[in-house]
Curated annotation (Swiss-Prot):
Its EC number is 2.1.1.380. One of its GO terms (biological process) is antibiotic biosynthetic process. This is 3-amino-4-hydroxybenzoate 4-O-methyltransferase. It is an enzyme of class 2 (transferase). S-adenosyl-L-methionine binds at D227, G253, D254, F255, R270. The keyword Lyase does not apply. Coiled coil: none annotated. SUPFAM superfamilies: S-adenosyl-L-methionine-dependent methyltransferases, Winged helix' DNA-binding domain. One of its GO terms (molecular function) is O-methyltransferase activity. Keywords: Antibiotic biosynthesis, Methyltransferase, S-adenosyl-L-methionine, Transferase.
């Protein structure tokens, strides 16, 4: 076809795309987007181990001590290879754990600050146990998938709680990690009224971090912190003992055998999700029989919800399978049914941060 001489030519980069062109481009972009997303999901272990080693190697503490430092200096401080550490720092910068670049050096971001040793809001112990023992257990996910049993037990030859009892250093890390993952504890006494309580029994309360927050806000009640003997032995220098020693009794024991008597409030914070329904009913039965007339039960757990968005509860539901075998997260209806079978009625459900909920229950009439 002959083009008239006076016709205006359209530059190639100004050509208007037709509908088929746009459809073709969208089809080409979709696999790239999906492929990138799949790679990011598949390589999640890159992030886990990078963050774990940033804490475990002393890198984060070295950066904190220097304020800002280049890779070579940080390699000298941590006894690592300068090139390898430089690569790790670049990756951590992409994850928003550190900021900066060489030669000016790297500093910690707010995320990186959470990996420091000994700071008030530190999540270092959380990262340490997830990046080591739990990481190895997840490597045996196929065992849990085939058998429905704990991959942790398969890898370490012992269930988690027996293993912690046999390894005091890890037990201490675990209990500190459990506190590090609970920034919502301070809000519990804000959303639930403990002022009328006379005796609060915290069942399997660890080092007493939740009980500490409750007693700080409510000066009237006395309390019992009840947990395994090796856990109770670790609480001597914790705030629950040092700040509330005259109000708190530390009691070692096994909640499958019984719980301390006479409480009018029994706390179960992130305990029931560790066990199957049968074991939960045993724990709840002991709480019911020990409870003073008119007593109540306070349960803190993540609740499963339906939806396609990101959900910590869905991830922890898998984590309970891998690490504990019989453990599981449950939805509100499942907890209501469980409580009713144990002789309680669910009175209220209150939302807390990190997809956690406080469920208050009383004895059924």
């Amino acid at each position: 076809m002959t083009v008239p001489e006076n016709a205006q030519h359209t530059a190639p980069d100004q050509t208007q795309h037709t509908a088929p062109d746009r459809t073709r481009q969208a089809q080409q972009a979709a696999p790239d987007t999906a492929g990138r997303r799949l790679i990011e999901l598949m390589a999640g272990f890159w992030k886990t181990q990078a963050i774990y080693l940033a804490a475990e190697s002393g890198l984060v503490d070295a950066i904190a001590a220097a304020g800002r430092a280049p890779a070579v200096e940080l390699a000298n401080r941590t006894g690592t290879d300068p090139d390898a550490l430089g690569r790790l720092l670049l990756f951590l910068e992409s994850l928003d754990v550190v900021s900066g670049e060489d030669p000016a050096g790297y500093a910690l971001t707010p995320v990186g600050e959470l990996l420091r040793t000994g700071t008030q809001d530190s999540m270092r112990d959380h990262v340490r146990i997830y990046g080591s023992h739990f990481y190895r257990a997840w490597g045996a996910l196929d065992h849990s998938l085939r058998t429905g049993r704990s991959a942790f037990t398969e890898v370490y030859g012992s269930d988690l709680f027996r293993y912690l009892n046999q390894h005091p250093d890890l037990s201490l890390t675990y209990e500190r990690a459990m506190v590090a993952g609970t920034p919502f504890f301070a809000q519990v006494p804000e959303v639930h009224d403990f002022s009328g309580a006379r005796l609060i029994v915290d069942v399997a309360g660890g080092h007493g971090a939740l009980l500490h927050e409750i007693l700080k806000s409510c000066p009237e009640p006395r309390a019992v912190l009840f947990d395994a003997p090796h856990v109770i032995a670790e609480t001597a220098d914790r705030p629950i003992a040092s700040e509330h020693g005259d109000r708190v009794t530390l009691v070692p024991g096994d909640f499958f055998e019984g719980v301390p008597q006479g409480g009018d409030v029994y706390l179960l914070s992130r305990i029931l999700h560790c066990f199957d329904d049968e074991a939960c009913l045993r724990i709840l039965a002991h709480c019911r029989s020990a409870m003073a007339p008119g007593g109540r039960l306070v349960v803190v757990e993540r609740l499963l919800t339906r939806g396609t968005g990101s959900s910590l509860a869905q991830g922890y539901n898998m984590h309970m399978l891998v690490v504990l075998g019989g453990g599981r997260e449950r939805d509100e209806d499942a907890y209501r049914t469980l409580l009713e079978k144990a002789g309680f009625q669910l009175d209220s459900v209150t939302t807390l941060p990190l997809e956690t909920h406080l469920m208050a229950a009383t004895l059924r009439r």
